[in-house]
Amino acid sequence: AGSAASTGSQSAGSASNVSASDFKVGAIYINKKSDTAGYTYAHHTGITKAMEALGMDVDKQLFIVDEVPEDDTQVGAAVDTLVGEGCNIIFGISFGYLNEMEVKAEEYPDVIFSHATGFKSNETNYNNYFGRIYQARYLAGLAAGLKSLETGNNNIGYVSAYDTEYAETCSGINGFTLGVQAVNPDATVYVKELGAWTDEVNEYAFAEELINSYNCGVIAQHCDS
C-alpha cells in the first residue's frame, strides 16, 4: 500500500457507484504502518486481509496516512489528503479522531467514514465499530492467573494507556482482573496508567517499576507501544 501524499478538497465519487476495481480505501493510523505488532499493526493487517479476500489490489487501492496524533487539525489534514487521493471509504483507528471525522463526514457526504472505538454516527456516511475487546482481556487474565499459580507469585502488573476515563481502558482493566481472579483469587493486579495510547519510554519504565518495586511475575499491557 502506498502512503497518501497529495491533498485535495474534492469529494470522492459515491461509494455505491464505484466498481470494485476502482474502489479506494483510506486509513488513518495513530502509529507507524510498518509496525510489526500492536494496535496499529492489527488494524493494518485486518484491512489488508479484508481487501485481499475481496479481490482488491492492496498496493493500488489502499492509501495510508500514519503517525497521526489525536489532534483535530492533523486528523482533518489526513482526511483531506485521502479524499484528494479519491478514497471512497476512510477508516480512522484512534478514539480521539471521532470529532474531526464527524466534521469531515459532513464536508464530504459521498465518502464513507468508519471510526474505530468511538460512539458517534450520522446514519448516512459516518459509522463506528469495535470488538468486545474486554472479552479477550478476560482470557488474557485467565492466562496470567494460571501463570501466577505456576510460579507461586501472586503479584501481576498491568500497564494501561488510560485509567477509568475511557470505557475501553476501564473495561480492559476490569476484564483482565476478573480473569485473573477467576483462577487465582489470591492474586493482586497492580495497574499503571500511561496517560497516552503510545509512549515507549514510559511503558518500559512502568514495566520495570512493576517488576522491581511490586515484584510482579507477570505483566500485561493495553497500549500501542
Per-segment meaning from a language model:
Residues 2-225:
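A residue-level marker of the well-folded mature domains of exported/periplasmic proteins
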